């Protein structure tokens, strides 16, 4: 959920987590050119870790877990490290899938104090203007910050939206996006007066901005 909906989470904190059905359940993904893969692509978690670039991640795992192998945690950590600088990783020696100690009032594996301290300390900007958003499709995850993708050019590829801000100008570039809307509330929250989308400039006013075909596929 954190990789697909980064606009909803300031912190992602998996405890004894597994990566995907393909890595944990033993059912490999079809070829990426297959429509069956396109339908399952949203569960291919490593494809979307770039969405966590400006988020905190706290991974917890017992090194004797006989349910979800700790290799799942180490592998996911490897995927995350190129993008996430706010990364913490706790391995509990000798612990299985469910474990407890004396650090938390509840079970330590789910009430780990350092994880909750991290959650208390981090804040989410709902209208962030500096981001990369990658989604398997608009029918899975269409919105991040002020951008909502209405339709993709093809279901065979992820859609990608990159945003940056310089002064009162926000610049957005897209890939595999057929049409989208930009929230006036979100743009104004960033005090933007101009937004540039794929090289075209649009003035920021009080109305949402629709870009791309208004008819056809959805």
Predicted regions, residues:
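Short glycine-enriched nucleophile-adjacent loop
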Residues: 1-7, 12
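Sec/Tat-exported extracytoplasmic proteins
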Residues: 5, 16, 119-123
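The conserved beta1-alpha1 loop
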Residues: 16, 61, 172
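Short, solvent-exposed loop/turn segments at secondary-structure junctions
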Residues: 19-20, 64-65, 177
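The feature captures the conserved acid-bearing segment of alpha/beta-hydrolase catalytic domains
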Residues: 23-120
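Alpha/beta-hydrolase-fold serine-hydrolase catalytic core, especially in secreted/extracellular enzymes
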Residues: 82-218
């Amino acid at each position: 959920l954190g990789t697909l909906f980064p606009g909803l989470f300031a912190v992602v904190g998996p405890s004894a987590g597994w990566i995907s059905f393909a890595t944990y359940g033993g059912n490999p993904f079809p070829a990426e050119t297959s429509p069956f893969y396109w339908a399952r692509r949203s569960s291919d978690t490593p494809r979307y870790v770039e969405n966590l670039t400006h988020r905190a991640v706290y991974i917890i795992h017992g090194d004797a877990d006989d349910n979800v192998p700790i290799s799942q945690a180490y592998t996911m950590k490897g995927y995350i490290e190129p993008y996430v600088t706010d990364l913490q990783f706790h391995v509990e020696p000798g612990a299985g899938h469910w474990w407890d100690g004396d650090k938390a009032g509840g079970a330590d594996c789910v009430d780990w104090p350092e994880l909750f301290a991290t959650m208390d300390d981090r804040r989410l900007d709902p209208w962030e203007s500096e981001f990369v958003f990658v989604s398997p499709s608009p029918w899975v995850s269409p919105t991040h910050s002020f951008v909502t993708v209405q339709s993709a050019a093809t279901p065979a590829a992820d859609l990608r939206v990159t945003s940056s801000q310089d002064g009162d100008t926000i610049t957005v570039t897209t890939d595999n996006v057929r049409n989208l809307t930009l929230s006036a509330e979100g743009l104004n929250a960033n005090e933007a007066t101009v937004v540039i989308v794929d090289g075209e400039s649009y003035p920021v006013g009080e109305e949402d901005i629709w870009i791309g075909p208004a008819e056809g596929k959805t």
